[in-house]
Amino acid sequence: MKSRIARVALFLGLLAASAPQTVLALDLLRGQRVYNMHCSVCHGLNGVPVIQQAPSFATKERLMQPDMVLVQSVKMGKTIMPPFMGILKDDEILDALHYARTLR
């Protein structure tokens, strides 16, 4: 009986330990999808802008701002960037930002 309890406890512990990584991977996949659909048109698939006015994400300087500042920028728009309020939800924007931070 004790060995069965130990096995169940071990299984639950391993399951709990792996859950955040799985969630993170799914968030990055969602972020990649959102980024490729909405952001890459100007910021490029690899974070190097395809239009001169778009900031580079390859250097990461623009992405060092706090998440909520960047979410507001995306929602409200900036200079030539259109607003995405009503188009993207906050969690989609965050996923795209987290994905953009992985670009090199």
Sequence positions of predicted segments:
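Post-cleavage N-terminal segment of exported redox proteins
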Residues: M1-D27, S73, A100-R104
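Axial heme c-ligation environment in periplasmic c-type cytochrome domains
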Residues: V50-A58, S73-R104
